[in-house]
Amino acid sequence: MFISFEGIDGAGKSTIIKKLKRKLPKLYPDKKFVFTREPGGKKLKEAEKIRKILLDKKTNIDPMTETLLYAASRRVHLDSLIWPALKKGHIVISDRYVDSSYVYQGIARGLGVKVVKEINDIATSNFMPDYTFFLSISEEESIIRRHKRGKPDRLEMSSKDFFSRAYEGYFKIINSPTMADRFILVNAEENVGTILKNILNEFDKILKK
């Protein structure tokens, strides 16, 4: 089973996934969980090199090049980590996947979801998550949290308009008839304990199917 986590920057995905990394193996000792993230991937040298290029403040590339680099990194991620883990029967949980490209490059950068999807369909061999948790926060809360973090990377330094387009873009993707079924919406403006509890309840439903 492959599960991705999505959300606008500041939604708290990384924080929640760290907690799931501790909780899930204890709650389901008979299952093997593999946690990873994009761009890059757990101990994947080639994908991590691409990550450094993408997030480096000094990198100056156009949206198409950015999209192709994300797709290349994603292919390495799939081929070297995700697919081998799934073949072993493991449950793979990834912090971001193709939806991030649809939103950030397709909508916020203006390339168009159709173009970005075509590129990623080739790169991923049309491989999609079984479930996607979307951590939802308001645009205003996203701004507050991003400012608190400090030390922004290249993507995080993008304009307010860029993030506004990304925010709206996520809801376009979520409400798309071809994608809506796999999304699980989570109110990420609750306290961390409540968010974690709600997500664990959803995991319990998923893993009992």
UniProtKB/Swiss-Prot annotation:
Keywords for this protein: ATP-binding, Kinase, Nucleotide biosynthesis, Nucleotide-binding, Transferase
Question: Which EC number applies?
Answer: 2.7.4.9
Give yes or no: UniProt keyword Protease. no
- BP GO terms, sorted: dTDP biosynthetic process; dTTP biosynthetic process; dUDP biosynthetic process
Q: Check the record and name the CDD domains matching this protein.
A: TMPK
Give a yes or no for keyword Membrane in this entry. Answer: no
Q: Which Gene3D superfamilies match?
A: P-loop containing nucleotide triphosphate hydrolases
Reactions this protein catalyses: dTMP + ATP = dTDP + ADP
Enzyme class, spelled out: transferase
One Pfam family hit: Thymidylate_kin
Q: Which residues form a coiled coil?
A: none
What HAMAP family does the record tag this protein with?
Thymidylate_kinase
Described by its record, this protein's role is as follows: Phosphorylation of dTMP to form dTDP in both de novo and salvage pathways of dTTP synthesis.
Protein name stated in the entry: Thymidylate kinase
Q: Which gene encodes it?
A: tmk
